[in-house]
Curated annotation (Swiss-Prot):
Biological-process GO terms, alphabetical: xylan catabolic process
EC number: 3.2.1.8
The protein, known as: Endo-1,4-beta-xylanase A
Species per Swiss-Prot/TrEMBL record: Geobacillus stearothermophilus
Superkingdom to which the source organism belongs: Bacteria
Keyword set includes Iron-sulfur: no
GO molecular function: endo-1,4-beta-xylanase activity
Cleaved signal peptide residues: 1-19
Length: 210
């Protein structure tokens, strides 16, 4: 399954330095992501602070999440998924884009019936788990810059991460591992969110991000 999405917002960017990246603390969330292709029912609530909730039924594709207008390779993303109950295809994932080059990236902590795969590159150990690293290609597909051909970078946890407690994604671990495999993110950063994504499925989630 390759989930399709088209973002409707013009996004700010920031420059990325070269070399290995280290973790830094996060500023408060400032970005609310809500997109649906119009299929089925998606009821998303932009809660206070970093909280959001979404209930979906018989959907096409949607992406809902909270995070930051400008992404960072150094960010530690903290979150608590108090509810994560997909029935069918869905991801609980760090999600974002870079430009120059145009890259769509995922760090998937949990999923529904489908665990994403691709061109296998190796593994990275981070935050108490082991993630498989993949690349995939999208051809003439929707992107933050309209219809484009671009790469996707993936880190997918080998086992679903337990939910209901405070956990972290140290993104620099993934960025450095990707770079060691020749997977170089772009030099400018669009948004970065901790997202619930669903495709032809139903379910509900309630997530707080900081």
């Amino acid at each position: 399954m390759k989930l399709k999405k088209k973002m409707l917002t013009l996004l700010l960017t920031a420059s990325m330095s070269f070399g290995l990246f280290g973790a830094t603390s996060s500023a408060a969330t400032d970005y609310w992501q809500y997109w649906t292709d119009g299929g089925g029912m998606v009821n998303a609530v932009n809660g206070p602070g970093g909280n959001y909730s979404v209930t979906w039924q018989n959907t096409g594709n949607f992406v809902v999440g909270k995070g930051w207008t400008v992404g960072s390779p150094n960010r530690v993303i903290n979150y608590n998924a108090g509810i994560w109950e997909p029935s069918g295809n869905g991801y609980l994932t760090l999600y974002g884009w870079t430009r120059n080059a145009l890259i769509e990236y995922y760090v998937v902590d949990s999923w529904g019936t489908y665990r994403p795969t691709g061109n296998y590159k190796g593994t990275v150990n981070s935050d108490g788990g082991t993630y498989d690293i993949y690349t995939t290609m999208r051809y003439n597909a929707p992107s933050i810059d309209g219809t484009q051909t671009f790469q996707q970078f993936w880190s997918v946890r080998q086992s679903k991460r337990p939910t209901g407690s405070n956990v972290s994604i140290t993104f620099s671990n993934h960025v450095n591992a990707w770079r060691s495999k020749g997977m170089n993110l772009g030099s400018s950063w669009a948004y970065q969110v901790l997202a619930t994504e669903g495709y032809q499925s139903s379910g509900r989630s309630n997530v707080t991000v900081w």
